[in-house]
């Protein structure tokens, strides 16, 4: 799938995504003094509401849905639910969000779920035990019946299925020839699975999981097999930077994200992007990237309005758009280590 394919067809194309997304270089002394170039792949600028990898994963699924109700899954702070709800509003599609945690049904909606509801998504809460079994056919059928959505087009949690993985392949194709290492934060692994397939030979793709547990590699291999028939690309995982798990943080991560925003004028989403950038700075300090190499970080999302403001997302003086030419050849990232983050704020 090419970048034009990933933009979708029909009504999706009418939403006018910005593809390919901008690729910009930032001047960061923590990389520069080690002879490493840092690029930001600004997927957060693809669309104001269907941001980054959410666009790349949702577009092919919405095409396949062909106007049917779209049902998907997520937690109370799911970026995926928000993107699906926004897509439904923009395209006039009915959406149903199956939310983990029956106990939430009687409580006021948090800002994330309130936004989903405002965008027209019908929320259906299920207990956590059933949610864990949602991939089992009998459990899924029961959930669909209870949600009065038996004819819905089902998109898995995080949006990662074969269609989504093939959609994310265009991200790798857009970056091919520009970097020696491409790094992306990982939730369900679908973005990395497609990115690695599109990046081509001679490029190392590094995933930074935001969940703990060390289970992601098997899932990525399964996603690539489903989408492409087998493994694709040279990829690895750097598992030290989850900060305790999904949507969990620490004072040093918040301080780092605020500092990065101040240095470069780039809004930093906290659940995924902050952990990715923190990991890359820490790895640079460990001399994990060879002198003369180019590292591209995929900015898969932006802070939501309750976290930050949409203003200021355009190109700024610290973010130079790159010409379409190959970055310097050189090193590869180091991945596959496990454990907690165990680090303070990377040195300035």
Description of each model-found segment:
Residues 1-324, 346-348:
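PLP-dependent amino-acid enzyme catalytic core
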Residues 326-328, 333:
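A cross-taxon signal for low-complexity, glycine/charged-rich
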